[in-house]
Every structure is written in C-alpha cells, then in structure tokens.
A protein has these predicted regions:
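Proline-aspartate-enriched helix->loop->beta-strand connector
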Residues: 81-97, 111, 212-229
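A short, structured surface patch at a secondary-structure boundary
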Residues: 30-87, 91-97, 101, 196-199
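Structured C-terminal subdomain patch of bacterial secreted/periplasmic proteins
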Residues: 29-30, 34, 123-136, 143, ...
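Sec-dependent N-terminal signal peptides
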Residues: 4-13
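Flexible loop/hinge segments that line or gate small-molecule binding clefts
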Residues: 99-131
Length: 290
C-alpha cells in the first residue's frame, strides 16, 4: 500500500512538472484581444488554450471576419469591462486606434497591455506579426506565417508578369459612403504590389478621404473597386449610381464596365489575411480564373 501511495505521489509530481513545462513555460497564457485583427493574428500564432477571450461579435461576421468558425468557442469581450476583468487576462492586445480607456485597462486587470501600431503597408503588417510572435514566444510560428505570405505574393507577382503585358491598371477605391483610400493605406500598398496604380495616391491624396463625383471623373480610372458587405449594401443600387449617371459615361471604368465589387474583408485585412486580400484584388483586376 505504501509503495502504491509513493508511486501515485511520484506520478502526480511528474505530471505537474510536465504540465508546467508544457503550458506555464510561456510568459502569457491568458491572452485577450480587443480587435478583429488581433483576434486573427492570435489564432494564427498561438494554441487556443492560451487565448482567454476575443474582441466580439464582429469576428463572427463572415462579411468582415476571416475566422468565423474558429472564433465561436471564445468569450467575446465587446468592450465590456466586467467581462474583461472576469477573464483574468495576463496580456491584452489592442490597436492604437482603440484609445478609449486604454490607460485604465492595465490597472483594472493587472495585465500587460500591448498597443500595436495599425499597419499601413504589407511590410508593416509582417513586422507586426513578427513583433507579436516574439511577444507571445511563438517566433517560429510567426516566421512560418510570414514565409507563407511572401511565397504566395511572389507566386502572384510572377503570374501577373507572365500573363499581363499592358500598361499598369489605374485603380480607384470608392466606397458606398463616397470615401476613398490614398497614400499611406494598406489598399494603396496592395495595388502597388499587384503592379497597379492607385489614382488617388497618384493625385497626392493621403489616407482616407471623401471623394466627389467630379474628382472621380477627373481621375478617370480604368477600374473602380467598391468594397461591400452584402447584407448591408445593395449592389444593384450602387451599380446604378455609376451606370445610370450620364456624367460618368466617359469614365473608362464605367465605359468598359469595370466597376467591381469586393467584400470588405478582402480590402481591409490588417492581419496575415492581407495576402488573401492581395490575391483577391489581383483576381478581380486582372480577371484571373480560379
């Protein structure tokens, strides 16, 4: 009986040591993300058992999120302080644009708060993934993600070079709210990476701005990209804004019927899914088949 008791103690001790090495070896094991992009990056970098909670219902919206199924199993913070505290996080991931009460989050929870700079280019996105991977001690996974992105981008650029010999397509982003993306935006970088020209950036317009109908006519793009969320936007109605307005009739994109609609998640990804967006943009611009 004593031998059995001693064996059980040793077995318990060994199991505790193994668990400590396997799970507690990492500095942060109750990580919470407060943004969709943070959710997407964390789920790509770390095991699910190190995630205590994710941003909210936005990650369940298939029009915007790339992680609809993966995100279902995690508590959703939704900016609720009580929920955040109850999750007992040791690390909170938050974007620099989410400034409300950031200074108080660490005090309320006792957690480290990591505020990341929102990327405005492909290279900045890779740097963020690398920095976050180092923070959560998943450097190898971070490098795998980056390598996958770079390999896919190289293959895409080779495909474009092989199959398209014309002038650089001149592209305009135009939202249903009448806004556009110029210099220092991920969209501008995505366009450059597929050998296109963002006509708004070319005109010297910076960041996100309203754009008038007159300016669209002046810029005369070859292609107009309209980001949409199908459950919110009426594609037919938006199409009529272009094709039934006689003032647009000489704009190349309208004349040649090259107004294309793309999901928001393919135009505005701030995570490793940026490469998916770049591939989708190229598919639309160059009309690549599957």
């Amino acid at each position: 009986m004593k031998k059995l008791f001693l064996f059980l103690i040793l077995l318990f001790s060994f199991t505790a040591i193994v668990n400590a090495k396997g799970v507690q070896a990492k500095k942060y094991n109750h990580i919470v993300s407060l943004t969709l992009s943070g959710d997407e990056m964390l789920l790509g970098l770390i095991p699910e058992n190190r995630i205590a909670g994710l941003s909210g219902k936005i990650n369940g919206d298939k029009e915007i999120s790339n992680i609809v199924d993966k995100a279902k199993k995690f508590p959703k913070v939704e900016g609720n302080e009580e929920v955040l505290i109850s999750l007992e996080p040791d690390l909170i991931i938050v974007a620099d644009w989410l400034t409300k009460r950031i200074d108080d989050i660490g005090t309320m929870t006792g957690a480290k708060v990591y505020i990341y700079k929102t990327p405005s280019s492909y290279e900045e996105q890779k740097k963020l993934i690398r920095d976050l991977a180092n923070l959560v001690e998943e450097k190898e996974n971070g490098e795998k993600i980056i390598k996958n992105m770079d390999n896919r981008l190289k293959a895409l650029q080779n495909k474009i070079a092989k199959n398209y010999k014309g002038a650089k397509p001149r592209i305009l982003l135009y939202t249903s709210f009448g806004t556009t993306s110029g210099k220092n935006t991920t969209f501008n970088d995505m366009v450059k990476l597929i050998n296109g020209t963002n006509v708004v950036a070319e005109a010297g317009i910076d960041r996100f701005k309203d754009i008038s109908k007159e300016k669209v006519i002046e810029l005369n793009p070859d292609i107009i990209i309209v980001p949409i969320a199908k459950k919110y936007d009426n594609v037919d109605k938006i199409s009529k804004l272009f094709y039934e307005d006689s003032s647009f009739k000489n704009v190349k994109a309208i004349k040649n019927k090259k107004v294309y609609f793309m999901q928001y998640k393919d135009i505005t990804p701030i995570s490793q899914y940026m490469i998916d967006g770049i591939e989708e943009l190229a598919k639309v611009v160059y009309q690549f088949k599957e």
